Curated annotation (Swiss-Prot):
General function of this protein: Involved in peptide bond synthesis. Alleviates ribosome stalling that occurs when 3 or more consecutive Pro residues or the sequence PPG is present in a protein, possibly by augmenting the peptidyl transferase activity of the ribosome. Modification of Lys-38 is required for alleviation.
Pathway as given in its UniProt record: Protein biosynthesis; polypeptide chain elongation
Matching PANTHER family: ELONGATION FACTOR P, ELONGATION FACTOR P (EF-P) FAMILY PROTEIN
Residues found modified as N6-(3,6-diaminohexanoyl)-5-hydroxylysine: 38
Species of provenance: Mannheimia succiniciproducens (strain KCTC 0769BP / MBEL55E)
Protein name as annotated: Elongation factor P
Keywords assigned: Cytoplasm, Elongation factor, Hydroxylation, Protein biosynthesis
GO MF, one annotated term: translation elongation factor activity
Gene that encodes it: efp
Post-translational changes noted in the entry: May be beta-lysylated on the epsilon-amino group of Lys-38 by the combined action of EpmA and EpmB, and then hydroxylated on the C5 position of the same residue by EpmC (if this protein is present). Lysylation is critical for the stimulatory effect of EF-P on peptide-bond formation. The lysylation moiety may extend toward the peptidyltransferase center and stabilize the terminal 3-CCA end of the tRNA. Hydroxylation of the C5 position on Lys-38 may allow additional potential stabilizing hydrogen-bond interactions with the P-tRNA.
A GO biological-process term: peptide biosynthetic process
Length: 192
């Protein structure tokens, strides 16, 4: 019996595509097709290794094939954290998955109880946790904004209920709830 592995060529490349590189699943962060005046066309990519988290710049000759990564993305709800692991539950089957600090990474500061996250599994184990694109968090510490103080940077640091620190407008006060984009870590709006 022959096992046929799925492959992608450089024409299939787009951000978010997962493939195998040096025996490790990777995801394309950025890609650009380059046709130089002389020589063969190539695709310039920035990839992130899903297990080690390393970000690399890799060039592929036009038409090169890569093996698809056998990874699975699941929408799971964040449940709780103990000393070593973060626990996520499938909303329909109630199956639990535990992710270590390497898999959670920077997502820790955006995890709220019951927030739906995307967990990437490889060989049945979580290797990556992606929080929701937007979260609503309470401001627990920030400098008071002085009325009329609009000179300068136009923002101030604020510590949120999860421990994350983001730059917010001067009018934001302690106790207010704000919406934050988890992909960039930037303030989006005040929640009414």
């Amino acid at each position: 019996m022959r096992i046929i592995m799925a492959t992608y060529t450089t024409s299939d490349f787009k951000p978010g595509l997962k493939f195998m590189q040096d025996g490790e699943p990777c995801v394309i962060v950025e890609n650009e097709f380059v046709k130089p005046g002389k020589g063969q066309a190539f695709t310039r990519t920035r990839i992130r290794k899903l297990i080690s988290g390393k970000v690399l710049d890799v060039n592929f000759k036009s038409g090169t094939s890569v093996e698809a990564a056998d990874v699975m993305d699941l929408n799971l709800n964040y449940s709780y954290k103990d000393e070593d692991f973060w626990y996520f539950m499938h909303p329909e089957t109630f199956e639990q998955y535990s992710a270590d600090s390497k898999a959670v990474g920077d997502a820790e500061k955006w995890l709220l109880d019951q927030a739906e996250c995307i967990i990437t599994l490889w060989n049945g184990s979580p290797i990556s946790v992606t929080p929701p694109n937007f979260v609503e968090l309470e401001v627990v510490d920030t400098d008071p904004g002085l009325k009329g103080d609009t000179a300068g940077t136009g923002g101030k640091p604020a510590t949120l209920s999860t421990g994350a620190v983001v730059k917010v407008p001067l009018f934001i006060q302690i106790g207010e709830v704000i919406k934050v984009d988890t992909r960039s870590g930037e303030y989006v709006s005040r929640v009414k």
